[in-house]
């Protein structure tokens, strides 16, 4: 399997550990219509590569962007919250939990040869019952940058 998949699986494993508030952590950007809320999605969006010319065997430095997307029902729309907190509070709590769990050290504990992991950005949006009948929800997207290296022709092996 490609190293991106290894990293994506490691991130999902870390986020699924207790304590957790998530019904599930999906390794895809497409949730099923029967998904139990709240949930997280983990997927790679891009990967930049640079060949290091100082190595005769061909080494690629890679930088992948992994998105962690938290999906939450808007309070008061059947989420059982009783409107005790605002959607902003819930989005901030989600962000804090992900940032607390997902660190360079926790990733290296699962995938030892990664070079670094850093939070690049966080975006938040709210979708209120749009025309297609979807659930009113909030989405928090965190972009994480992971750097690592592979040998030329061996994208399945970290070095």
Regions found by a protein language model. Give the residues of each.
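Charged, amphipathic alpha-helical segments and their flanking helix caps
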Residues: 1-34, 47-159
